[in-house]
């Protein structure tokens, strides 16, 4: 309810001020450690990023299971989880979807943000498109440009999956508003 009220506030003003609000959150995140640690929970940030619904992540995992089950069993889930543990994130248990993939009794091993799961889904799709393309030299390296990348979570996930598949990424350009780009540093 609080998030929807904040969205109405942002959009009710003259024009769409969402980028101004988002830029201000990114700027404050760079200036203060507490704000940095919790920026993924800030409604003014999650209006733009980190707002993947749980149901979308469940659907993404279902697709990944149907298409990449063997790979999911081999990938290092601690690296995937790092996207949610370097700063606070709204995580959910995906134990029901991952209990036959991640071998653990520890409930924390199944905790991921829906956005991280969605980034993983996107990364598998991107890297497999690159691998199957006859126009891209995956051994000598490919170049990727991401526009609207926020703190760089998708970039992190694409690099993780690329390493798993031994796809060489020669360059990865991240383009966003000034303060969002500074978050990546």
Model-inferred region functions:
Residues 181-182:
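Short alpha-helix immediately C-terminal to the canonical SAM-binding loop
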Residues 14-16, 21-135:
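Conserved Class I S-adenosyl-L-methionine-dependent methyltransferase catalytic core
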Residues 152-166:
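Conserved SAM-binding loop of SAM-dependent methyltransferases across substrates and taxa
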Residues 140-150:
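Conserved class I S-adenosyl-L-methionine
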Residues 122, 141, 158:
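P-loop NTPase catalytic core of nucleic-acid-dependent motor ATPases
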Residues 185:
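S-adenosyl-L-methionine
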Residues 171-177:
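Conserved SAM-binding motif I beta-strand of class I
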Residues 1-5:
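Intrinsically disordered, low-structural-confidence terminal and linker regions
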